[in-house]
Amino acid sequence: MAGKTLYDKLWEAHEVKRRDDGSSLIYIDRHIIHEVTSPQAFEGLRLANRKPWRIDTNIATPDHNVPTTPERKGGIEAIVDQVSRLQVQTLDENCDEYGIVEFKMNDERQGIVHVISPEQGATLPGMTVVCGDSHTSTHGAFGALAHGIGTSEVEHVLATQCLVAKKMKNMLVRVEGQLPAGVTAKDIVLAVIGKIGTAGGNGHAMEFAGSAIRELSMEGRMTICNMSIEAGARVGLVATDATTVAYVEGRPYAPKGEQWKQAVESWKDLVSDEDAVFDTVVELDASQIKPQVSWGTSPEMVLAVDQRVPDPAAEADLVKRGSIERALKYMGLTANQAITDIKLDRVFIGSCTNSRIEDLRAAAEIAKGRKVAASVKQAIVVPGSGLVKAQAEREGLDKIFLEAGFEWREPGCSMCLAMNPDRLESGEHCASTSNRNFEGRQGAGGRTHLVSPAMAAAAAVAGHFIDVRELIQGSAA
């Protein structure tokens, strides 16, 4: 009998009932709530005269709509947009009514849902974790079965603590070797997406393994699992190991005392068996990965920084040729244009992909002693949570950014998506550490280029894309 994958083990441990149609009822351990996808769910509970089944499994915070500028200290009334203000206010009211723990807008523990849950220890190995946000896959970095859900499913979880789901196939992404200096977890996952495409992981739970993955910090692993959704997979996973345990230990929601010892012992099995069989296997050599930059309107439209934008005339597939032509037109680029010739109007360092302390340190290392180029209209750094912000300030990172000409903001989703005041104007190019570069994602007509924090900082000081390895080598010389 073949061994089991990590996904198999997590699924079986939470399968309440298998149904005749092939679907299963899955128990949910942790439910994370934000202001955008929860109002209708709570209203559904009221209309059905129900209450949350297990209040203690829920944790909430506003993130999508909150302003990241100082005026937010004025409270909810400082949110200018009426819809945004109403959503944040409604979350507060719903959590207060049902006794759900919420880190409100000006609580130091507030931040992006996928940052605050891990840093609180609310995301633990072996859990099932859901949230009304597609990037819930982030939490798979802990060896947890985590994925996004829709608003109706948010209501189902609140009411029953279960979801109906169908088991997915297993995909293994093995990344072996040592990453070159200046190449990060963000570059790994962009390279994976560039290799398999945004549909490559469709219908799969995607486990990341190999020596390069094992060497990553938890922040790096979260970055990779965060963007498994952009690779087509609903679920991203990394096996639990000593790095995972060290990160979780001592956090507020983590087990304590004897329960901690028991938990750590049980987590040892949160790995795929050596003889486990995967439906699909993808392999990458970490030593060959270079800093990545997306050039088009899909995350799969990504290249190494030393490459050139594709020429649609060289593409034989008419559908692909049309996609390239449309992307070039929207992005305002020309065929065969060098990535390093793309000039930037704005730079955004933040989002649930890259706003943790390790990300800010990497960007600050590049920004230190340098200045944002005069041609760059705005460069902002948005910590993923109040706790990340406080840690960065203790380390003096805020001063490095401010002296270089970056804006230092309050935590929130910010410029990742055009649901708050931080957004692009039409035609502007932005080097962004976020996860999506669709048309209009950062604002109507905005042009998004996905990069790592170090690459974003390098672009800010150069005014155009530059190979960050040149700056690192220059600093070492």
UniProtKB/Swiss-Prot annotation:
CDD domains: IPMI (cd01583)
Free-text cofactor note: Binds 1 [4Fe-4S] cluster per subunit.
UniProt xrefs under PROSITE patterns: ACONITASE_1, ACONITASE_2
EC nos: 4.2.1.33
Gene3D superfamilies for this protein: Aconitase, domain 3
Record GO terms (molecular function): 3-isopropylmalate dehydratase activity; 4 iron, 4 sulfur cluster binding; metal ion binding
GO biological process: L-leucine biosynthetic process
Name of the molecule in the record: 3-isopropylmalate dehydratase large subunit
Organism: Pseudomonas putida (strain GB-1)
Name of the gene this protein is made from: leuC
